[in-house]
Amino acid sequence: MGPTINCEPTKRGDLVKVTFSLVARNGNARVALVGDFNGWRQGANMFKRRGDTDVASVTLSAGRRYEFRYVDDDGTWFNDEGAHGYAPNEFGGDNSVVDLRDGFGKPDD
């Protein structure tokens, strides 16, 4: 199983719980979820190990798109293969995108 993004509306309706899941990295490597929703701070949203999967959840405002990436213990930044899209960043690469504008992040077919 590759990376997955699950988006669920909350009871408030204007917020969406977004859960990011990754195949657990080798050994005890830790992964951080970083993005425009947390100021790109590496310690703000850490993945938690659940069996052979690393999981992180954030609650975000519906109706917009967010850019994010993952960074592991050794400082390696990487994107989500299951992202809803990608956006160029100022470092010459791309950021992953989760799109909560319509349908709570379900990519177009």
Where would I find each of the regions flagged by the language model?
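N-terminal edge beta-strand
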Residues: 1-14
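Compositionally biased low-complexity segments at domain edges in trafficked proteins
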Residues: 2-3, 98-109
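Aromatic-rich carbohydrate-binding modules that target alpha-glucans
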Residues: 11-65, 73-101
